[in-house]
């Protein structure tokens, strides 16, 4: 069983914000599969296919580890079969990169997952939102995506959804081979 988790915050006030890019990728995957995240359990919502789960925690970003821990254990999913998707301020707007393992680099949702699963060996896809120049990170990431960035994010979300469908129906090696994402092992 494969588990793909998009991180974000629940609620209309967070919809279409930089911090909810993980949610947007999951929504795009569901759209391409013509499925709905119709199960609600473990304080999250998900769709369970034959060999995969696509999901969004409803715990708020900083407590995402609780959902990932519970769904992983309930469905007996190996850590090696989990991919987490989230926003990253240290990447340029629209740039995406994959990280096989390592620290959360200050991303609190990922930190929560690392703490709950007791390992840094968790695959993740980071979507760049750039670091703000003149405002606190916390307010910047929770603002709606501005018009001049919407097309860039729509494109990267669509591309990531296609690449993650490759993972769902194949394996991680195939995903890496078809992906043009930067592979970072740090």
Curated annotation (Swiss-Prot):
Q: Where is this site: Stabilizes the basic form of H active site to accept a proton?
A: 87
Give a Pfam family name. Pept_tRNA_hydro
Q: Where is the signal peptide?
A: none
Q: Where is this site: Discriminates between blocked and unblocked aminoacyl-tRNA?
A: 9
The catalytic residues are: 19 (proton acceptor)
Single Gene Ontology BP term? rescue of stalled ribosome
Which residues are listed for tRNA binding in this entry? 14, 60, 62
Where does the UniProt annotation locate this protein? Cytoplasm
What sort of enzyme, by top EC class, is this? Answer: hydrolase
One GO molecular function term of this record is: peptidyl-tRNA hydrolase activity
What keywords were assigned to this record?
Cytoplasm, Hydrolase, RNA-binding, tRNA-binding
Q: Which HAMAP family match?
A: Pept_tRNA_hydro_bact (MF_00083)
Function text? Hydrolyzes ribosome-free peptidyl-tRNAs (with 1 or more amino acids incorporated), which drop off the ribosome during protein synthesis, or as a result of ribosome stalling. Catalyzes the release of premature peptidyl moieties from peptidyl-tRNA molecules trapped in stalled 50S ribosomal subunits, and thus maintains levels of free tRNAs and 50S ribosomes.
- Subunit architecture: Monomer.
The identity of this protein, by name, is: Peptidyl-tRNA hydrolase
Species of origin: Mycoplasmopsis pulmonis (strain UAB CTIP)
Give the source lineage, highest ranks first: Bacteria, Bacillati, Mycoplasmatota, Mycoplasmoidales, Metamycoplasmataceae
